[in-house]
Amino acid sequence: ISPLDCMGCGVCVGQCPVGALTMVGQESELPEQDVFNYCVSKVSDKKDMQDLTVKGSQFKQPMLEFSGSCAGCAETSYARLVTQLFGDRMYISNATGCSSIWGGPGATSPYCTDKNGHGPAWCNSLFEDNAEHGFGMYVGQEKIREDLMAKTEQLLAIEWAQPALKEAAQKWLDTKDDGNANAEATKEYVAALQANIATVDELAAVPKFAEHAAELKAKGEKFCDCDACKLACDILDKKDYLSKKSVWIFGGDGWAYDIGFGGVDHVLAQNKNVNVFVFDTEVYSNTGGQASKASNIGQVAQFAAAGKETKKKSLSEIAMSYGYIYVAQVAMGANPAQTIKAITEAEAYNGPSLIIGYSPCEMHSIK
């Protein structure tokens, strides 16, 4: 833990069940920053300790850091966990609301990258069109990926392509719908493509191609122009799209249940591989705690001072009525194991998914 990153909120001290923590002045703890720096720069990921359990998942690097959300905010806990599981290949479309405020404050971002420069690609459009915006992100990258698949199949059909390259290409195609396996296959495929593209200088070293190499060099070309090399170059130009992406649409209950419901319903109905995560605080948290359709009957909130007269909208049952949407409701504080199970199953499901995460909030005024 970095002493420079303490927010001073005191939540850890107040919640420690055995009273082991105390608040002290920052100056006395600053020497511990050297330990933090060592852990960040020198200690590598322990892949053999990382699995999809509550404990194992926490050995993975979080790609959401120091968001500045309210003390005890549950939304950031959910988002952080999702980035730990899929952050290096993750797309996020974020509805306007609390999660866009702590997720994208002016001039900075709490979303970060790993040592390879990979991390969540985050974007915020509007309140009312977030689902459609996220669906567009999915469709765009999927179209590029389909083109890469077609070019890979053309590459496999070329007789003189190197066996090692063909093997890596076939492995990439075979794992295209498996996020974790495809990530490793992508690394091997990119390495094989880079190793098997002939440069003009390498071509010139072969006597029968020397004249052609000179012509290419005169045109300013750097690589061989045979079909295999041209396809390999085209694929490498878009190598960032090779790995299977994990597309997530984040937003609160005011968005998913009320203002953006039409878009949520439409996108889920398309039967495409997108994941919708609703941070359900059961009120409009970002604007001060007004009642939403996610508020419970009898709940006291702004615009419902005498208690809400109607019951909570069953968004999960509406989604389940389609018959092909993965639906889960989670509460990390009550059952963290089920939370991880739901998130990983939603990502693994080759179709639309909806996760509704109960998110305790300061607007609940529970002390």
Can you say where each PLM-predicted feature lies in the sequence?
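Ferredoxin-like iron-sulfur electron-transfer modules
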Residues: 1-8, 26-31, 57-67, 241-245, ...
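Iron-sulfur cluster-binding cysteine motifs and their immediate structural context
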Residues: 1-7, 11-29, 77, 87, ...
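Acidic, Ser/Thr-rich peripheral helices and adjacent loops at domain boundaries
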Residues: 35-49, 111-121, 291-313, 367
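Structured alpha-helical segments in the cores of large, soluble enzyme domains
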Residues: 43-55, 141-145, 179-181, 235-241, ...
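N-terminal amphipathic, basic-rich helices that act as targeting or association modules
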Residues: 56, 64-96, 100-106
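N-terminal leader/propeptide and maturation segments of large enzyme subunits in energy/redox metabolism
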Residues: 126-187, 235
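Glycine-rich ThDP/TPP pyrophosphate-binding loop and its adjacent helix/strand module
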Residues: 188, 243-248, 258-273, 279, ...
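Amphipathic alpha-helical binding modules
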Residues: 207-234
